[in-house]
């Protein structure tokens, strides 16, 4: 019997590990995993870069609609897009049935690993990562219930999440 009664929602910078950590976390808890970006792509039958060509506002509206629907099913692990914090209504929706975890990865590690070509907001160059961090870091901190430092392996980060959320494995 599963003891988890809420969604586990991962927020953080692009490239911080939300999707890969989320998949591993969901597997270890034997619950569903949802990557919001993949749900958006599926809903619109377009890639994220194609969606952004219609404008960031179009993407954000769709993101909010998908979050509203997805967050009603629980328990599951949800990996959000990095910009989910730009609209506080998204946070309110997610907090109704979930605990929000900020995956904080050091910027030097993100910059070293990130593939910018499929990330529309940073496709102009890696310096955009620093600008996004300045814009969003305080939002991630203030909207999260728990902050986890992802500075080692993904497996270690999953263990940190499990310990902080007091989930028995």
Which ranges hold each PLM region?
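NTP-dependent small-molecule kinase module
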Residues: 1-3, 20, 24, 28, ...
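Hydrophobic anchor at the beta1->P-loop junction of P-loop NTPases
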Residues: 10
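P-loop (Walker A) phosphate-binding loop of NTP-binding proteins
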Residues: 13
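Conserved glycine(s) of the Walker
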Residues: 17
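Post-Walker A helix-loop "phosphate-sensing" segment adjacent to the P-loop in P-loop NTPases
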Residues: 27-38
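ATP-dependent small-molecule kinase phosphotransfer cores
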Residues: 38-84, 88-92, 134
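Short glycine-rich anion-binding loops that position phosphate/pyrophosphate groups of nucleotides
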Residues: 82-84, 106-108, 153
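A glycine- and Lys/Arg-enriched "phosphate-lid" helix/loop adjacent to the NTP-binding pocket
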Residues: 97-138
């Amino acid at each position: 019997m599963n003891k988890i009664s809420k969604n586990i929602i991962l927020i953080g910078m692009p490239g911080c590990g939300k999707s890969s950590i989320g998949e591993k976390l969901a597997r270890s808890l034997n619950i569903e995993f949802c990557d919001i970006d993949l749900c958006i792509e599926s809903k619109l039958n377009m890639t994220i870069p194609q969606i952004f060509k219609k404008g960031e506002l179009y993407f954000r509206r769709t993101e909010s609609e998908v979050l509203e629907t997805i967050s009603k099913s629980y328990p599951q692990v949800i990996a959000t897009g990095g910009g989910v914090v730009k609209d506080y209504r998204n946070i309110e929706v997610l907090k109704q049935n979930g605990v929000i975890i900020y995956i904080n990865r050091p910027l030097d590690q993100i910059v070293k690993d990130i593939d910018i070509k499929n990330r529309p907001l940073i496709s102009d160059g890696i310096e955009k990562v620093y600008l996004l961090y300045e814009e969003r870091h305080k939002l991630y901190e203030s909207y999260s219930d728990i902050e986890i430092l992802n500075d080692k392996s993904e497996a270690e980060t999953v263990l940190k999440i499990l310990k902080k959320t007091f989930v028995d494995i």
